[in-house]
Amino acid sequence: MEIKLDLTCDLKNFINKDKQYTIPIFIPHKGCPNSCIFCNQKKISGQIKNVDLSDVDNIIKTYLSYYKDLSKKIEIAFFGGSFTGIDINLQIDYLKVAKKYIDNGEVNSIRLSTRPDYISEEILVMLKEYGVDTIELGVQSMDDKILSIAKRGHTSQDVIRASKLIKKYNIRLGHQIMIGLPNSTMETEIYTIKECLKLKPAQLRIYPVYVIEDSELYDMYNGREYTPLSIAEAVKRCVAVVKECQSEDVAIIRLGLQSTSEITSSNSNIFGPVCDNFAEYVISAIKIGRASCRERV
């Protein structure tokens, strides 16, 4: 794969200054009011079974038993659905299980992911009470036409409102964006990251769009209504997005989807820029662009 880029940027955004252990707890499709066209959370998380309270407790205990470096911070992370869209009592039950490990000193913090339109002051007060210190918003795009086509069910204004509220409550803000959604272009990707950076997220995840079975996007792909990005184009767009982050104090904590038994380049039923080491391609492209610029100076 040949990628020709002309970029002057470094890799400071990829440096994780606060190295820590993360205990991931996936709650597939819990709390989501609708199905976005790209979504099949059970395949994305590699998990079919729903998670009950005893599962949460067992997952935490299992991960804690693996950790050897006790000097590292430990974080519990609820992923896989819109956490704050779950019934409020179930949210509290999940968080109570996690918080007891904070109270006994075994865990330092809790993070979760959710939709921008499922954030309110009432929710944030509760989350603060139970030790949540990072909230990642599924932004995906700041282009309202793209959000509508993707059937997200929220607008860019919801992202702005939720981001400001989260920062008001001194909770660390994370944004998740997707590269290659239907109707997207290099220009809309740049617009999205610029609009996100105005909201000062502390952390960023960048995901190229994969076409996954049993999603509406899969039907669009089969009907030739959608063409996924090539790896080369996805890398090119991601490098441009990363370049926009260089002057900002934002940590890029993931590039590409986490590989699972379902989400892997060996799965012939996943289409798009599927690559088990996508971040390495992006970082290599940045380094190549930086070196080529220095050679001309």
Locate each region found by the language model.
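Radical SAM enzyme [4Fe-4S]-AdoMet core and its adjacent flexible, acidic
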Residues: 208-246, 265-283
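Residue-level detector of conserved catalytic or cofactor/ligand-binding positions
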Residues: 288-297
